[in-house]
Amino acid sequence: MTEIPADLHYTEEHEWVRRTGDTTVRIGITDYAQSQLGDVVFVQLPDVGSELTAGSTFGEVESTKSVSDLFAPITAKVIAANGDLDSDPQLVNSDPYGEGWLVDLEAASAADLDAALNDLLDASGYGDATD
């Protein structure tokens, strides 16, 4: 059974979203996703300052099994990327909801972020999607 924390939002593309402030979120891939990928060997992330559009690709996770695209869960600007993944991409496997985070994003406004998060899955909905 994979871990699905109740306090996060989820996408059908297996990303998690944690609200970190009025207009900010942290993004990563779920425990289910990392278990399906196998050993992660490389993570390609966008540059800080990049503008992401909800539903568009923003990077890749490469594992011993495959290369998978990362999809932006919300429209926002990249304010941080996890540089630790350059030297230790396996953090995505060992701690997908903690040290294995991918990017921090900032939405244009709290209202925009509220609306975007309302469109995502909750833990129960994501659990149903992975059964």
Curated annotation (Swiss-Prot):
CDD domains assigned: GCS_H
Domain Lipoyl-binding span(s) in chain numbering: 24-106
Gene Ontology terms describing biological process: glycine decarboxylation via glycine cleavage system
UniProt cross-references to InterPro entries, sorted A to Z: Biotin_lipoyl, GCV_H, GCV_H/Fam206, GCV_H_sub, Single_hybrid_motif
Record-linked Gene3D superfamilies: 2.40.50.100
N6-lipoyllysine found at: 65
Cofactor note: Binds 1 lipoyl cofactor covalently.
Any Pfam family the entry gives: GCV_H
Domain of life: Bacteria
Entry cofactors: (R)-lipoate
Key words, A-Z: Lipoyl
Gene Ontology annotations for the cellular component aspect, listed alphabetically: cytosol; glycine cleavage complex
Cited function: The glycine cleavage system catalyzes the degradation of glycine. The H protein shuttles the methylamine group of glycine from the P protein to the T protein.
Family of the protein in this entry: Belongs to the GcvH family.
Subunit structure as annotated in this protein's UniProt entry: The glycine cleavage system is composed of four proteins: P, T, L and H.
Name listed for the protein in its UniProt record: Glycine cleavage system H protein
Organism: Mycobacteroides abscessus (strain ATCC 19977 / DSM 44196 / CCUG 20993 / CIP 104536 / JCM 13569 / NCTC 13031 / TMC 1543 / L948)
